Amino acid sequence: MKLSTVIAVTFVLAIAVARAETDEVSAAAENSTRSWLSLTDKGQYEQSWTDAASLFQAAISTADWVRSLSAVRSPLGHLKSRELASATFARTLPGAPDGEYVVFHFSTSFENKASAIETVTVMKDEDNKWRVAGYYIK
C-alpha cells in the first residue's frame, strides 16, 4: 500500500472519530440544555438556578434569578414549540474563563409571543457535566 493511501485512510478515520466525538458532546450538551429549559418551562426557576453552572450561580443569587426570570417568562405564557436553530462550540467567550462551551439558539414560540429566540450557553462545569452558564431570550 502506498504511503499516500495510508495517510489518506488515516486522515479519513481521524475525521470520522472527531466527528463522532463532536456529535457525542453536542448531544450531551443539548440534552442538558433541554432538561434545564424544561425546568424554566414549568416555572421551576429556583431549581433551574440550582442545576446551573457554578459560574452562573456566582454571578446571580437565587432570589435575583427567580425574580428576573419570573419577570421575563411569566408574561410569555406557556411554551408552544422550541426548535434548535444552531449550536456553536467555543473555548473562549467574552467575560468568561476559558473552557468548553456550546452556545445554543432556539426558535421558540410561546402562548403570548409567537416568535422568540432563546440563547442558552452551556459549559463543562467543575464536575465535568454540561450545565447552563447563561440564558437570554429575545
Where in the sequence are the language-model features?
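Short, low-complexity N-terminal intrinsically disordered segments enriched in polar/charged residues
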Residues: 2-4, 11, 16-44
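Second-shell loop/turn segments in exported
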Residues: 21-23, 34-37, 52-58, 107-109
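Exposed beta-sheet edge and beta->alpha loop/turn motif
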Residues: 87-138
